[in-house]
Amino acid sequence: MTTTQIIKPKRIAYYLRYCQNVHYFASIKPFLDYFISCGIHQNHVVVRRLAHGYQEIADYRGYTHLFTDDCDLVSYDLILTPTFLRDDEEGAQHLAVQIFHGMSDKPFTYQRNFSQYLLCLCAGQRQLDRLHSYECNHRMPATMVGYPKFDRIPANPPLYKNEKKAVIYCPTWRKGNMSSIELFLSNVDIIHVLAERYNLIVKPHPNIFNPEREFYESRIVAQLEQLPNIRLIRSGNVMGWFSQADLFVGDISASGYEWLYFNRPMVFLNPQPGVLKPSQDSNAWTYLWQCGPVCDNVRELPTLIANELNSDSYSDVRETVLHYSIFNPRGGTATQLAVAHILALLSSS
């Protein structure tokens, strides 16, 4: 005689906070897909306000029926969140699993107090080390699982159909004066040179397009949309576009850590020349900058790109940083490991 364990359905909140946080959605999507396929638990994509036209956002296609503005977080059995719970949401921390939406070098990610969370799922050792460098997180519940977005890279349609090399530029958002976007846009002649030589893809941080977020400026969006001979990408998951590119140009963008998966050349456009410099200190804002040359003068950007495409001398460094930053980066097991931890929490609640 065998007994079958009956699993009680639970209400799971996937908390994005802002409806247009497509990069947050990309980080919870592997878990959402898993629990939808199980057909047991109730899955709710929770936002504070359902933005006008959110049903038309390409990243949300097939999932919009799960969106809700029921933000009574303590009414859910478990919260999976790539955002960071704020002071007025502290009462929900004991239900929350932190799904880090990237591997940022920005310090304000790690200064937050995660000690009351159920669990923090970290991409790798670097993230753990940075979190533990703050006293408030010495006892935080955390484990390394890898980076779920690496498990299944989308097969996006080709942006170009020619033999040119492809360069992808990924500026971060404008918080803390860390973005190179305005420096880039103020040198239109350099953009024209790059667009003539290469297949130029521009994929800004999604917050640059989000009017609900601080530092949004419609003029920047308008300038981006008016750039000729480029492909402008609005997407929460850059991995499928990265697979089509030969070289990455970034600044303090966490997407650079995702680019490491491909081990292809990188160039960093310095948003604060003379102030920010490359560093091997894993707590530095510019730790990733050891993985490629830093451009302190935007006029030199075309030359640096050409040099790196012709002779890449940073491959070994990139691999070292990748394996320190991400547990088993190309093993395809991150989602599986993370889900096992989440299932254990669900069964104990």
Question: Whereabouts are the PLM-identified features?
Answer:
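Nucleotide-activated donor-dependent transferases that construct or modify glycoconjugates
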Residues: 4-21, 169
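Active-site and donor-binding regions of nucleotide-sugar-utilizing enzymes
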Residues: 13-154
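Donor nucleotide-activated moiety binding/catalytic core segment of transferases
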Residues: 67-71, 214-257
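A donor-sugar binding/catalytic signature common to diverse glycosyltransferases
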Residues: 88-98, 236-278
